[in-house]
Amino acid sequence: MHVRRAAARWHNGSVSVFQSFRDIFTLRDDPSDRALDMPSRLEAPHGFARISLRPVREDDQEDWNDVRWANRDWLMPWESGDPLGGRPLSFNEWVRRMRQDEQAGVGAVFLIEYQMQIVGQVSLGAISYGAMRTGMVGYWVSQRYAGHGFAPLAVAMLADWAFRDPSGPHLHRIEIAILPENHRSKRVAAKLGLTDEGLRRSYMYVNGEWRDHESYSLLAGDVPGSVTDRLVPRG
């Protein structure tokens, strides 16, 4: 009798696990239903630095290139890449790829603007649905504006959009992977109250080599209100 009960528990548990994987990898609905309704602009809440987030456009190429070139040494230690050395996308190809990702509901990239100038970028990628509903967050801010609180505010705004905004993907969890020596980025995670989930070995190819990353997560259930409420307004 005890053997039968144990077998039944194992069977039910296995079905649950296998069902979860089927939910993840099987499209049970029309993929077009997952298309992200990208907002034209997300504004910082009143009382915070007056940054805004907006999707990248093809006519941003010159300004985006200028900011990236001016910050090339500042950003290089943290740049991820393709270990197989694939051909880099042109700017317009990159924008078209973003539009495809938005339509598929698997990614969204926003420019960070301050006083009508591009000062950085924040993105939500590798979005999974089904039993997981999770996504990876990435960001960078121009060295000129480091220390102004733009990065944590931009990540908080993105998280609020991803968790609860009607136009967002309604995720359960977001994750940030951070190089152990990237103390500025770890302060962003700390300011937002993300949970340190430990080290992931050789997790991402960065600046020419596979690197360990520390994983930080935030759940929609961790935040009863707005993620930006976790920050102190800076005006």
Give names to the regions the model predicted.
Residues 2-63, 67-74, 109-235:
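Acyl-donor (CoA/ACP) binding surface of acyl/acetyltransferases
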Residues 56, 67, 83-90, 104:
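Generic, well-ordered alpha-helical segments
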Residues 76-96:
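Conserved GNAT-fold acetyl-CoA-binding loop/helix
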Residues 83-85, 96-111:
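A short helix-loop-beta-strand connector motif used in the catalytic cores of GNAT acetyltransferases and
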